[in-house]
């Protein structure tokens, strides 16, 4: 803060306010900065009140017929059928790509789909869909970005000056952003909103489970026993928060040799059945490690990726996700 204040200079002495010792009592409280500016020879200050300009009045009072936007106003206008979270526990298992493929598969079934990227410090959803433009602000709230197939997307990366800008925030700020993405974004009418959670059981996941009415969680793991161990932590968090688990998806289960067609288990034997049995949840499917998927995610063309493997997984998720047992998602 003192470094920033150093940019202000005394017009007569040509030195910064900090160098002249004019900045005192710097305090930071809940994002609000206060400090005392001590000016030599100044004993009191008089305020010259003038009439506000028309622009200043418009910022404070809405025009006739308009209402001032209140935080969370969009939430009451949204009509979202189901909210599904995708959670992994361990990073690097392809959770975000599974979330994106789920959204694409549901959209291909004719559903109205949105994706809320709750991975605030490591967002990747916009990159996969080739989105970069800042979402506009509407009269009620933020309008989500839209992919070429009509999937609505909201992510912190769409609000940053560059896609590789670091988000160095503590828990309260991260939680606040997630709540805004739910309550201040005009999602409109959706059949399903897919929420891409960050790895682990951090504040972000806790905020989602406490603030957003989830209908279920899809767990994503990989063949490694380590990934299975960590995803069990994620499952236990969901249970403690009273969020139902739709099932388990194993990603990067195997790859197919492009020359001979042999199935190769790159990360060793699958642990999916064992992990699903330990958790008592269904194994929804196993997804191969496909270089084409990686290329199309990098190119922002995940909607153009074609595979026969994920469609039955998406259908199982749609069939199982429900408000109460026995009620299908659509």
Short names for language-model regions:
Residues 1-5, 19-22, 29-49:
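Short, non-transmembrane amphipathic alpha-helical segments
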Residues 20, 39-40, 48-71, 235-330:
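C-terminal lobe/tail of nucleotide-utilizing enzymes
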Residues 75-81:
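Phosphate-binding P-loop
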Residues 82-120, 231, 235:
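Walker A/P-loop phosphate-binding motif and the immediately C-terminal alpha-helix
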Residues 92-101, 122-126, 197-205, 226-230:
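Short glycine/serine/threonine-rich phosphate/pyrophosphate-binding segments
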Residues 106-171, 175, 182, 273:
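Phosphate-binding loop that captures ATP/GTP phosphates
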Residues 154, 197, 312:
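Glycine-rich phosphate-binding loops of nucleotide-dependent enzymes
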Residues 160-208, 227:
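Phosphate-binding/switch loop-helix module in NTP-utilizing enzymes
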């Amino acid at each position: 803060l003192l470094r920033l204040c150093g940019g202000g200079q005394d017009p007569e002495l040509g030195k910064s306010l900090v160098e002249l010792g004019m900045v005192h009592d710097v305090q930071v409280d809940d994002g609000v900065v206060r400090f005392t500016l001590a000016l030599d020879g100044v004993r009191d200050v008089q305020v010259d009140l003038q009439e506000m300009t028309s622009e200043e009045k418009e910022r404070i009072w809405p025009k006739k017929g308009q209402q001032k936007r209140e935080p969370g106003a969009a939430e009451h206008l949204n009509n979202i059928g189901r909210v599904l979270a995708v959670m992994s526990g361990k990073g690097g298992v392809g959770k975000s790509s599974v979330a994106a493929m789920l959204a694409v598969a549901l959209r291909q079934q004719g559903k109205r789909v949105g994706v809320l990227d709750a991975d605030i410090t490591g967002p990747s959803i916009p990159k996969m869909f080739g989105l970069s433009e800042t979402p506009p602000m509407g009269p009620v709230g933020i309008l989500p970005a839209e992919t070429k197939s009509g999937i609505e997307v909201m992510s912190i990366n769409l609000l940053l000056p560059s896609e590789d800008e670091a988000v160095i925030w503590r828990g309260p700020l991260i939680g606040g952003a997630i709540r805004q993405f739910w309550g201040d974004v005009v999602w409109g009418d959706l059949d399903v909103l897919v929420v891409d959670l960050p790895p682990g059981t951090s504040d972000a996941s806790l905020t989602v489970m406490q603030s957003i009415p989830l209908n279920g969680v899809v767990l994503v793991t990989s063949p490694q026993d380590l990934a299975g161990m960590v995803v069990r932590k994620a499952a236990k968090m969901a249970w403690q928060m009273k969020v139902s688990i739709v099932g388990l998806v194993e990603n990067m289960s195997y790859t197919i040799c492009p020359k001979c067609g042999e199935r190769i288990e790159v990360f060793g034997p699958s642990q999916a059945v064992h992990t699903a049995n330990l958790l008592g949840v269904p194994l929804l499917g196993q997804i191969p490690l496909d270089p084409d998927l990686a290329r199309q995610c990098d190119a922002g063309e995940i909607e153009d990726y074609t595979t026969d493997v994920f469609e039955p997984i998406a259908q199982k998720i749609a069939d199982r996700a429900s408000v109460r047992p026995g009620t299908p998602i659509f």
